[in-house]
Swiss-Prot record:
It comes from the Bacteria. Part of the 50S ribosomal subunit. Forms a cluster with proteins L14 and L19. This is Large ribosomal subunit protein uL3. The keyword Transferase does not apply. It comes from Bdellovibrio bacteriovorus (strain ATCC 15356 / DSM 50701 / NCIMB 9529 / HD100). Gene3D superfamilies: 3.30.160.810, Translation factors (2.40.30.10). The gene is rplC.
Amino acid sequence: MSETTETQNTAGLKLNGLFAFKEGMATIYNENGEAVPVTVLRYEPWFVSQIKTNEADGYEAIQVACHPKKAKNSNKAEKGHLEKAGFENGAQFVKELRQAAPEGTVVGAQISIDSLAKGDFVKITSKSKGKGFAGSVKRWGFAGGPASHGSKFHRRPGSSGNRTWPGRVMPGKKFPGHLGAETVTVKNVEVVQIIAEENVLMVKGPVPGARNTLVKLVRE
């Protein structure tokens, strides 16, 4: 690894977390020769776009942005807000990390991949795979009805009614509907490896979502 490449990827602002994109799963081997299943995450340059404070915003956070937009896809307000961060036409992703800004933090600073280190345990938040419309058996794990002996009740939800009161189906009742595509959080996930020169992070086990899903990692 050249000195220039190392500086480019590791220099920058270190926060208590970062955002990355899911690539897929792989298997690596640790020092004891044991196979470890990992999810490979692709890190791309994120820049500070706003510093939020208790006085001005009511809470402390660092807003970060990534992926420049095309001019035709952005509006004037977006351009004005993100121009100082280096995004003339806005950004595809604008997210926040809830923490106080480290000393010396300025708008436009790049977030370092070294915000996390090997051995850290993180809380991961991402969007699960969408599976379309699903019945109550697949979506909620309903047992279903008899499979044979003349039964005509197999995978239907069954009765959803109540009594004279309330005389309606209560909100939140488990019914068929859209499965997946929900925000999912997984805690205590170990960072197995960070390859700064390739902008790659590896975390132990699976991570919710399809390939290229945006993943938020926050140190616990």
